[in-house]
């Protein structure tokens, strides 16, 4: 299964600009960010952040609520998880910046320095192939094959296993 690091800068740009990658929440099908991202891409084009700011003296980081906060129900109780959906203008500028030829090459180079023969990194984003319907399903399939199945195989070889999990990282 192909990871995002195997993509060219052009394909990586397209990957990030897909609605399902802009917001990976399980939202109703009628909520699609494609038109928003296409609008922002057309409106901003090659302009810099400074060129599109309304108030040239203030950066987005100086404002509260520049992103869109949603509350997602965590379980059947009264626990909600705050999720920020990135401001589409800032998201576009970030995607455009990281997928320039030089920056994308550097990102891929740095990730190569993290490679270790005894550590498998499963969390790198996966790209859907012919079998998968979405990038998310590609990631789930990869998780199933490289974590769940590999755990079963390794359990035959090792006597003990250390497991950790974050159960509620958004507690109040």
Can you say where each PLM-predicted feature lies in the sequence?
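Conserved two-metal-ion catalytic palm core of "right-hand" nucleic acid polymerases
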Residues: 1-172
């Amino acid at each position: 299964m192909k990871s995002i690091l195997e993509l060219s800068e052009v394909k990586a740009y397209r990957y990030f600009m897909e609605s399902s990658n802009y917001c990976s929440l399980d939202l109703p099908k009628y909520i699609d960010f494609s038109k928003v991202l296409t609008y922002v891409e057309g409106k901003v084009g090659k302009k810099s952040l400074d060129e599109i700011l309304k108030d040239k003296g203030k950066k987005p980081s100086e404002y509260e609520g520049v992103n869109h906060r949603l509350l997602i129900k965590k379980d059947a109780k009264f626990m909600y998880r705050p999720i920020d959906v990135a401001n589409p203008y800032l998201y576009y500028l970030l995607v455009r910046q990281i997928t320039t030829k030089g920056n994308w090459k550097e990102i891929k180079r740095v990730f190569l320095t993290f490679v270790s023969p005894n550590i498998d990194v499963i969390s790198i984003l996966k790209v859907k192939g012919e079998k998968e319907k979405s990038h998310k399903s590609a990631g789930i399939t990869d998780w199933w094959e490289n974590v769940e199945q590999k755990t079963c195989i390794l359990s035959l070889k090792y006597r003990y296993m250390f497991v950790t999990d974050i159960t509620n990282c958004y507690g109040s």
